[in-house]
A protein has these predicted regions:
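Extracytoplasmic/secreted proteins, especially bacterial periplasmic and envelope-associated proteins
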Residues: 41, 45, 69, 80, ...
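Bacterial N-terminal signal peptides that target proteins for export
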Residues: 1-7
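The canonical Cys-X-X-Cys-His
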Residues: 46-56, 109, 113
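Gly/Gly-Pro-rich "capping" loops immediately C-terminal to redox-active cysteine motifs
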Residues: 55-83
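Electrostatic cytochrome c docking/interface patches
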Residues: 22-45, 59-68
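Bacterial signal peptide processing site
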Residues: 17-21
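Axial heme c-ligation environment in periplasmic c-type cytochrome domains
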Residues: 61, 84-117
Length: 119
């Protein structure tokens, strides 16, 4: 019985350690909060419609520039990610509440936020 209990405690500890891989560090959060697209019009749209979720770790949205949050999504392909941005998915509202974003804007913003991540 003690052996089983010890193994269970060890397993829970290991799970706790591995879960932190997807948790952004303070530097990741600072980078997400400071990042802006180089295009001024796109930067304005990002600040207005994307940052409230994608620069806040507790929002549940993938953090801008944080590779572990984007790899699984990028594996689905950019077209699928842009479709999810346009139509909405789970807590993501349709168009990210950027009603004046064109399809090209949505693609550019998605590419910007997922930059650095590779499938």
């Amino acid at each position: 019985m003690r052996t089983i209990l010890g193994m269970a405690v060890f397993a829970m500890g290991m799970c706790g350690c591995s879960a932190s891989v997807d948790k952004p560090a303070a530097a990741d959060l600072q980078r997400a909060q400071a990042a802006r697209p180089s295009d001024p019009q796109l930067a304005e749209r990002y600040e207005r419609s994307c940052m409230a979720c994608h620069a806040v770790a507790a929002s549940g949205a993938p953090l801008t520039g944080f590779t572990p949050h984007w790899q699984r999504r990028l594996a689905q392909g950019m077209d699928q990610m842009v479709r999810h941005a346009a139509e909405g998915l789970n807590a993501m509202p349709a168009r990210g509440q950027c009603n004046d974003c064109s399809p090209d804007d949505l693609r550019a913003l998605t590419r910007f936020m997922s930059a650095g991540a590779t499938p």
